[in-house]
C-alpha cells in the first residue's frame, strides 16, 4: 500500500495538472448501469494546466478563476476540495483554500483536464491540510468524481480495465507527441451513446495489446460525426502514426524526437491548434510532490492562446 508522502509544498504553491493520452482504447462491453468497460493505456504528458492553491484558516473553498460555462459548485476543482474537506478521517478543524487555475487544456478534448484538476486538488490539499490520506484513499475518493481521476492521483502510467478504475502500472516508451485540437469540443456522452460505437472488442492480455498496432474504438465515431476531427487526423496521418485520445476531440501523432514533432507543427494549417510534449510515465504532479524540479515548459503556445481566447 502506498503511504502518504510528507508535506512538500511547491513554491509558490503552484501545482501541475498534467494532460494524459490514451495510447490505445478498446471498448469491451457495457454494464447494466450504462458505464462502458474498456482496456486502455494511459500515459501522462509534461504539459497541462497549473493550479495555485493557498490554504485558508476557515472553511471557505474559493475558485478565483471561474471557467466559462461551468458553475463553480459543479467544477471538479471545487467538488474535489469539498469532498476532501468532508472526509470522515479529517479532524474537525477549519480547512479552506483559495484556488486559481491557469487553463491550458481544452474542455472536451480527451486530455483528461477536468479529472487531472480534481486529482491535483486532492493530492495538494491532502498535503497542505495534512490530512494524511494514502494515494489509495485519495484514488477511491477521486473515483466518485470520475473514472479517470484515480490514474492522475496514483501518478504512474497505467494499463486500465473495468471502467478505467482497475489500474496496473505500465512503462510505455516515452515518445514525443504532437497534440492537435481540431477546433471542436466533444462531450463524452455523444460518443458513448452512439449506436454504432463498437462495444464488443475481445478482452486481451496486456502483452497481446502491446504487440499489435494501437487503435481507439471511439475514433471511427468521432471521425464520422465531427468533420474537424476527420480533417485533423487525415492531415496528421500524412506525417506520422496518429489517432484519437479518449473520446476526443484531440488527436495526436507520435515521434521519436522533439525536433521532428516541432517540424510538423510548424507547417500545420492555421485552423489547427497544437503543442508538442513528451510522454512521461511519472506524473509531473508526483515529481513536484516528491520535491523534484520540472523541466520548464514554454509558457505560451498556439493551443494555450486558443484555449484562453474561448
Curated annotation (Swiss-Prot):
Catalytic activity: 4-CDP-2-C-methyl-D-erythritol + ATP = 4-CDP-2-C-methyl-D-erythritol 2-phosphate + ADP + H(+)
Tree of life domain: Bacteria
SUPFAM superfamilies: GHMP Kinase, C-terminal domain, Ribosomal protein S5 domain 2-like
Self-association state and partner proteins as the record states: Homodimer.
Function recorded in the entry: Catalyzes the phosphorylation of the position 2 hydroxy group of 4-diphosphocytidyl-2C-methyl-D-erythritol.
Active-site residues from the entry: 20, 148
The protein, known as: 4-diphosphocytidyl-2-C-methyl-D-erythritol kinase
Gene Ontology molecular-function annotations: 4-(cytidine 5'-diphospho)-2-C-methyl-D-erythritol kinase activity; ATP binding
The keyword Hydrolase appears for this protein: no
GO BP annotation list: isopentenyl diphosphate biosynthetic process, methylerythritol 4-phosphate pathway; terpenoid biosynthetic process
Pfam family, one: GHMP_kinases_N
Enzyme class: transferase
Organism: Yersinia pseudotuberculosis serotype O:3 (strain YPIII)
EC number: 2.7.1.148
Pathway(s) this gene product operates in, as recorded in its UniProt entry: Isoprenoid biosynthesis; isopentenyl diphosphate biosynthesis via DXP pathway; isopentenyl diphosphate from 1-deoxy-D-xylulose 5-phosphate: step 3/6
Positions contributing to ATP binding: 106-116
Similarity comment: Belongs to the GHMP kinase family. IspE subfamily.
Swiss-Prot/TrEMBL keywords: ATP-binding, Isoprene biosynthesis, Kinase, Nucleotide-binding, Transferase
The keyword Secreted is annotated on this UniProt entry: no
InterPro entries linked to this entry: GHMP_kinase_C_dom, GHMP_kinase_C_sf, GHMP_kinase_N_dom, IspE, Ribosomal_Su5_D2-typ_SF, Ribsml_uS5_D2-typ_fold_subgr
Amino acid at each position: 500500500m502506498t503511504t502518504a508522502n510528507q508535506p512538500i509544498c511547491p513554491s509558490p504553491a503552484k501545482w501541475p495538472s498534467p494532460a494524459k493520452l490514451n495510447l490505445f482504447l478498446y471498448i469491451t462491453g457495457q454494464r447494466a448501469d450504462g458505464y462502458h468497460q474498456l482496456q486502455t493505456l494511459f500515459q501522462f504528458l509534461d504539459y497541462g494546466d497549473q493550479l495555485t492553491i493557498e490554504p485558508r484558516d476557515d472553511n471557505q473553498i474559493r475558485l478565483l478563476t471561474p471557467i466559462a460555462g461551468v458553475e463553480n459548485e459543479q467544477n471538479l476543482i471545487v467538488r474535489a476540495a469539498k469532498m476532501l474537506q468532508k472526509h470522515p478521517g479529517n479532524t474537525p478543524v477549519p480547512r479552506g483554500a483559495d484556488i486559481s487555475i491557469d487553463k491550458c487544456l481544452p474542455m472536451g478534448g480527451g486530455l483528461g483536464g477536468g479529472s487531472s484538476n480534481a486529482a491535483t486538488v486532492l493530492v495538494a490539499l491532502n498535503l497542505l491540510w495534512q490530512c494524511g490520506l494514502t494515494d489509495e484513499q485519495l484514488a477511491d475518493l477521486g473515483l466518485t468524481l470520475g473514472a479517470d481521476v484515480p490514474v492522475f492521483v496514483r501518478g504512474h502510467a497505467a494499463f486500465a480495465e473495468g471502467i478505467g478504475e482497475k489500474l496496473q502500472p505500465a512503462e510505455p516508451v516515452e515518445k514525443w507527441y504532437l497534440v492537435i485540437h481540431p477546433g471542436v469540443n466533444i462531450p463524452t456522452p455523444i460518443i458513448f451513446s452512439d449506436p454504432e460505437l463498437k462495444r464488443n472488442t475481445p478482452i486481451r492480455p496486456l502483452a497481446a495489446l502491446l504487440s499489435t498496432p494501437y487503435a481507439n474504438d471511439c475514433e471511427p465515431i468521432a471521425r464520422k460525426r465531427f468533420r474537424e476531427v476527420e480533417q485533423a487526423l487525415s492531415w496528421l496521418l500524412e506525417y506520422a502514426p496518429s489517432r484519437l485520445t479518449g473520446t476526443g476531440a484531440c488527436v495526436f501523432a507520435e515521434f521519436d524526437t522533439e525536433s521532428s514533432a516541432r517540424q510538423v507543427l510548424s507547417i500545420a494549417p492555421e485552423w489547427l491548434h497544437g503543442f508538442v510534449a513528451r510522454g512521461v510515465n511519472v506524473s509531473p504532479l508526483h515529481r513536484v510532490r516528491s520535491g523534484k524540479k520540472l523541466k520548464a515548459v514554454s509558457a505560451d503556445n498556439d493551443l494555450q492562446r486558443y484555449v484562453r481566447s474561448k
